[in-house]
Curated annotation (Swiss-Prot):
Component of the acid-insoluble and acid-soluble organic matrix of the aragonitic skeleton (at protein level). Residues 49-168 are annotated as: Disordered. It comes from the Eukaryota. GO terms for cellular component: extracellular region. Residues 91-117 have a biased composition (Basic and acidic residues). It is found in: Secreted. Residues 71-90, 118-168 have a biased composition (Acidic residues). This is Secreted acidic protein 1A.
């Protein structure tokens, strides 16, 4: 009788491991995501999430993603990580430095030091250099090659295109 009971327990454990049924030795200090497979955070972290943000939707989202919320319910460790508040605690630009000064001026100075980017801005300079631009429409024949000969005329002097050059 005891042998039969041991066999039943053995096969129950074996069956449980193959089917992925929850084991009684499961870690009780862990919170797992929706499908029950991966550990996201511990109960201690979850308790800080519950204390900081009373909104249940944010609590569940924070538990699933593993994001710790600050005192205002925003992602981060403290008020210093809140992006919409400048350093004096009032609303302001995100790029203010620690003294509350705007860093936009620093960015403008950096752009001036770097110089202007003249990628294809001045077509007049290109034309003055004598470039043969196919997109110029200043009387150039786009069919001309570098020699200046009209490609529509063959070497015998006969016009290759079907136009009537008589002017009629």
């Amino acid at each position: 009788m005891a042998r039969d009971l041991l066999l039943v327990v053995f096969f129950a454990c074996l069956l449980q491991s193959f089917w992925g049924l929850p084991l009684p030795l499961k870690n009780e200090n862990a919170i797992v995501d929706g499908d029950g497979t991966s550990v996201v955070t511990t109960k201690e972290d979850a308790s800080t999430i519950f204390e900081r943000d009373p909104n249940p939707a944010n609590q569940v989202s924070a538990m699933v993603t593993g994001v710790i919320l600050d005192e205002n319910g925003d992602p981060g460790e403290s008020d210093e990580s809140v992006e919409n508040v400048d350093n004096d605690g009032e609303g302001g630009d995100k790029d203010d430095d620690k003294n509350g000064e705007d860093n936009d001026l620093d960015n403008k100075e950096h752009e001036e030091e770097k110089g202007d980017d003249d990628r294809g801005d001045d077509e007049e300079e290109d034309d003055a250099e004598g470039d043969n631009d196919s997109n110029d429409n200043e009387g150039d024949d786009d069919d001309d090659d570098d020699s200046g000969d009209d490609d529509d005329v063959d070497e015998s002097g006969a016009d290759e295109d079907d136009d009537d050059d008589s002017g009629d």
